[in-house]
Amino acid sequence: MLEGSCHCGAVRLTLPFAPEVATSCNCSLCRRLGGTLAYYEFGTVKIEGHPESTAEYIWGDRTLRTIHCKTCACVTHWEPLDPAPGAKHGVNLANFEPSLLASVRVRRFDGADTWKFIDE
């Protein structure tokens, strides 16, 4: 089991498997949050403490909600506002043991300008 949590432990996440790749994005939100995200099919990540211990931030084109703990403010994940078949979760790997992130290939995504990966 790959288990992680926000700093205070109110929001707990369990991943269905270790990611092979994660993304570091430089869009106006991600660069401020500083997270590295791995993506999973919506509904496959076990999230405890959500929604009772979380708050959300919705901005831009209003298709995603960024979720953070109400108590410690750690961003745990994002999820689609209207999940369609094939929808994804973006899970912040900073909430897991550092060894998980160290084992994952991190790709750099230019969400600020080109909307393309910039590490190819």
Where do the language-model regions lie?
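A short Gly-Trp-Pro
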Residues: 1-5, 10-120
